Amino acid sequence: MKKNKLLVIFFLSCLFSYIIYNYTISNRINILILGDNYLINSKYKTYDKYLLDKYYNINDLNKLFTNDNETYKDIINNIKNNYYIYEKGKKVYLNQKITESDIIILNANNENYFEKCFKGKSIIKKYDENVTNDIIKLKEIISKISPAKVIVISNYCYNDKYQLYNGDINLNNLYFKYQNTKSKRLNDKVNYQIYSEIVKYIE
């Protein structure tokens, strides 16, 4: 009798462990970062590290598809060409990662921003229009292959139309409000503010 009770307790424990494990797995989130590596290549604590500290249930925070000076047009072309990289000797396809992601964070064109955004009004207007069109097109392409939530960290000059369509997080505002140096690399305060804005969209 005692042996039967122990067996019942054992099997119940296994069952509860299995249920808890599956619940935990099903509630884990996959975050994919696309664009240039400007915001995540820094001596400071960057927003992706803040995210890892906060969310214990992150299954994967993938930033392998970020590259130097990446533009939104580059990302569009990479998706169209089913771009892949090698990780641990195996091919990892961008489109597959997009379909597996719950959240996709876009941040690109940073080099163009610093080059164009402090020029004359006509140049700024053209820059804003081009980037607006690229982001709208990129969002449309992503939506066809993934239901993931897309968050855009935008480097844009002040333009109402651009902000209306793509102003998820205005890096320009955060930079001038919290950056206490003229360095292009963002300090801890700006990185924390970016992280805080992302959390609002996640939650």
Describe each PLM feature range.
Residues 12-13, 34, 185:
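Alpha-helical architecture
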Residues 86-203:
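Alpha-helical cap/lid subdomain in secreted, periplasmic
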Residues 29-33, 38-126:
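Conserved SGNH/GDSL esterase-like catalytic core that processes O-acyl groups on lipids
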Residues 24-27, 55, 145-146:
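A structural signal for short coil/turn segments at secondary-structure junctions
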Residues 15-29:
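Membrane-interface motif at the C-terminal end of an N-terminal transmembrane signal
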Residues 1-12:
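N-terminal Sec-pathway targeting helices
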Residues 7-8, 16, 53, 172-175:
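Compositionally biased amphipathic helical and low-complexity segments enriched in hydrophobic
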